């Protein structure tokens, strides 16, 4: 008897629980037929010029039957040496595509349905973005060495139609920040689930609008005349405008029968919204944050950000901490500065900032990596000369690229936290590490950066299918109690607490109009 047949006849009472009355087979594929449809991404323009510090609106045209994934396309201007008679050292702050979004909202028939923030988009992607998608997403939102690492007048010129002899390899650091187009995926309910795509065909009497508030350029760009502690602000760099801005919407085209049903029948969608009650300023170690929330919420997410991390004015003042670290740190949610600066110079030695013997330059890139005669930035005071740099051009490039997602910053500002509902503890007091390590490990795709704290009422908060909520509409008094680290609020130091909540609501569409079933 063949061994496989012996296994087959070794059938007992316990096997009934596994293979009795079978419902599927692994040996004949089955599938389900779907309705016929087509999909096309169509560009939508804003009313008025989209630029730094402005609010613009895009009315979603009725090009298709449904509106699905929506991307913000923004082209950053070139920031180069021509903006000053002297040297220009400049960089876009981390994740420029997210940072330039102050807030973005979707409204139907004049009613705001949801509002989100660049800060929230960063936090959400820290929790949900898979490692496989990370590299592509970083490029989409501009978190690359070409944009977020400081440019240097001694580096290679930008390759373009007017510089036929320019270095074309992306690993060569440049003397300017190139004009670059970013693609920022919006995270509204209808963008993340095809079953929630917005039925434009059923909204004959209501317009759908996307309102976008763009941050001032001072909160997105860092540009000075020197990086040795004596630099001053490059005024002309902050006069630049966005080269272009628009939306790309994935339109869905339905077949005749489904199109008719979609247009004529009423619809109810269970949607997700974001609640944010604003920044709460704190200056002491023990704090009670009142949560003015409504609706069934599936998770709370909060950060505590020291004001010193985002002091944009201070970052342009010579010899201040943020000036030495090459700009403000808007996505640093820890109690200390990130001491790893966004600069090629940090990995190739301090002397690589200037002179013909830069660690990476246009002419010597990867040709003779050990020919550089620069000296190490760390010198023995008793030695006549310093040691040669041991980091090659290739090594410097690898270190710089690897460091894009590495940080030398502090710890979670939250030492302990506790949630109280109507004066009763929802859970016992927990250490901050429980909220930025254990909770994300249990409920999310990835572990976020330090300082992003989570408490989930749902088993699977990333999924649309409800798996647990807490109805804050039925809670009279909700309080988040936080004890913060000394480094966060020591002396006159202050910080901002931001609490976000993801809740469910119902969007009703009938008679050509749409609106929320439950208001605040």
Curated annotation (Swiss-Prot):
InterPro entries: Capsid_N, MCP_C, MCP_C_sf, VP_dsDNA_II. Keywords: Capsid protein, T=219 icosahedral capsid protein, Virion. The keyword Transit peptide does not apply. The keyword Phosphoprotein does not apply. Disulfide bonds: none annotated. Pfam families: Capsid_N, Capsid_NCLDV. Its main location: virion. One of its GO terms (molecular function) is structural molecule activity. It is found in: Virion. GO terms for cellular component: T=219 icosahedral capsid. Belongs to the NCLDV major capsid protein family. Major capsid protein that self assembles to form an icosahedral capsid with a T=219 symmetry. This is Major capsid protein. It comes from Phaeocystis pouchetii virus (PpV01).
